[in-house]
Amino acid sequence: MVTREEGKEKVKGLIELFEGLYSEKSAIEKRAYNEATVREKFLNPFFDALGWIMTSNDVEVEYSQVREDDGSKGKADYRFNLGAGKEFYAEAKKPYENLAEQSKHAIQARRYAYSANHPVTILTDFEEFRVYLGRGIAPKDEDQINTAWVSSLSCRYTD
């Protein structure tokens, strides 16, 4: 189990690594980082630093979910089990997508949560974490980026 101080140091290191890439890489190199790379290099270690055991039954990576609105099957990148039937999804995107302007990503993440009747879902590219409501607000293709939006956190380390 990761202690609070160890977790803080791991998160700080991840943010410093990410910020280093952000400042040093050209636009072309930045775009070469795909969703799988973000999960492997940043998100998996980040969630581990928060105390989630990524190889346990409490976390499923690429969790298959049937969408309630059209019956299609998609894969949320993460399913976190809090116990007692409480779960949430996290959907990863490649970095530099500007999640605050891409409503299609928010709608996708919300569909996973809505279909599973989860209260919230997280959309992230590691640079930003956006929290959306899932339960009770059916996602529609024409929804705006802030529909069902709860909060955003930017990945900047402050002690």
Language model: regions and residue ranges:
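Short, small/polar-rich loop/turn modules that mediate ligand/substrate recognition or access, typified
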Residues: 125
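A short, conserved, highly charged catalytic patch centered on acidic carboxylates
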Residues: 1-120, 128-158
